[in-house]
Swiss-Prot record:
Its EC number is 2.9.1.3. It comes from Bordetella petrii (strain ATCC BAA-461 / DSM 12804 / CCUG 43448). It is an enzyme of class 2 (transferase). This is tRNA 2-selenouridine synthase. InterPro entries: P-loop_NTPase (IPR027417), Rhodanese-like_dom (IPR001763), Rhodanese-like_dom_sf (IPR036873), SelU (IPR017582). One of its GO terms (molecular function) is tRNA 2-selenouridine synthase activity. The active site is at residue 95.
Length: 374
């Protein structure tokens, strides 16, 4: 039998399949990419056992657990574990702390199905701690550069052309603005942290010690940036991406109208998908109504409604350009101009897509001497 392991680094670097024996509620609050939840106890059973533990102690709780998970219930769960183990002979199982639940699952697999399957020592809690430490270690040991720029300049597009980028919006499944929600919701905070940490771990293992990330506020939708990373982002050098207003409008039209509408249609079907997309767009504008002011909000909402009606009627999207351009000129550009002014002392380079890409791939010697360019 393969030995139990506490080599968390290798588990995540190799995307090792993992069988999570925690209850569904625990799993839904946060897990690891690729982990499969095949619980020893369901939520109701776990609640009963937990109450018994508090009232009558560990031995009584264990006895109740064996009583609740017995007969056909036990057989079905062992069969599911056995199927997983056969499909993933290189995998491991775990519970919350690497204690009784994973040990019992191990024993049942061996005794009932004849399969010896290793567990993760320390379980979910230890792996979660390892990933959080991975982020803090990177902040302390690596260099970081912040990619800034006006809305629609294509910062995310550029990041995806770099091997050493950390795409925070990708991990958060949110574009980082009032209009940033996708058709499908965001991961939990724990899942966001875990995905980011594994990304960092793999890139450091590939030899990267300098990372580029997009300028973000502390929260990307419902996901908050790790505290030490966000604090560092207030000090890291900034590279500023520039583009024409026309290109920016085209890019926003692509991301927030064409692609977003397609997402909703894929998830909900043509008719309901378009209705939900239109409602999301209107709600996003409503979210900034107070900052826009009542009259300006009403004007933009009217232009947006007309564009949505034209899109639904004919499939044409050009009418959206009017409210996009107005929103840039009246709201986003003044806000970003103020932010650029505040960051002016940290801006080490500014240019168009190609020049910024070249700079970030091969920063000059003077840039490497700055904090963030080790």
């Amino acid at each position: 039998m393969r030995a139990d392991t506490n080599n968390y680094r290798e588990l995540f670097l190799r995307d090792v399949p993992m069988l999570d024996t925690r209850a569904p509620t625990e799993f839904s609050k946060g897990a690891f990419p690729g982990a499969v939840n095949l619980p020893l106890m369901d939520d109701a059973e776990r609640q009963q056992v937990g109450l018994c533990y508090k009232q009558r102690g560990q031995d009584a709780a264990i006895a109740l657990g064996h009583q609740l998970v017995s007969g056909p219930i036990k057989a079905r769960r062992v069969a599911a574990w056995a199927d997983f183990a056969r499909a993933h002979p290189d995998g491991y199982l775990y519970c919350f702390r690497g204690g009784l639940r994973s040990q019992i699952s191990q024993a049942w697999l061996k005794n009932e199905a004849g399969i010896e399957y290793p567990r993760v020592i320390g379980g979910y809690k230890a792996m979660r701690g390892f990933l959080l430490q991975t982020i803090d270690d990177a902040v302390a040991q690596c260099g970081f550069v912040v990619l800034g720029g006006m809305t629609g300049t294509g910062k995310t597009d550029l990041l995806r052309q770099l091997d050493n980028s950390l795409d925070l919006e990708h991990h958060a499944h949110h574009r980082g603005s009032s209009f940033g929600k996708h058709a499908v919701g965001q991961p939990t905070q724990i899942d966001f942290d875990n995905r980011l940490a594994i990304d960092i771990l793999k890139k450091r293992a590939a030899g990267h010690d300098r990372f580029v990330l997009e300028d973000e506020s502390q929260a990307i939708g419902a996901c908050s940036l790790p505290f030490e990373l966000y604090r560092g982002m207030q000090e890291y050098p900034v590279v500023w991406l520039e583009d024409t207003t026309e290109n920016r409008v085209n890019r926003i039209l692509r991301d927030y109208v064409i692609d977003l509408c397609a997402e909703f249609v894929d998830v909900h079907g043509p008719e309901q998908g378009f209705d939900r997309f239109a409602e999301r767009l209107r709600q996003s504008l409503d979210n900034i109504s107070r900052r826009l002011g009542g009259e300006r909000h009403r004007q933009l909402a009217g232009v947006m409604d007309a564009a949505l009606a034209e899109q639904q009627r004919s499939g044409r999207v050009d009418a959206h350009r009017a409210w996009i351009a107005a929103l840039l000129a009246q709201y986003y550009d003044p806000m970003y101009a103020y932010q650029r002014q505040r960051k002016s002392q940290r801006i080490v380079f500014a240019g168009d897509h190609q020049s910024v890409l070249q700079y970030l791939r091969d920063p000059p010697a003077v840039g490497r001497a700055l904090k963030g360019f080790p």
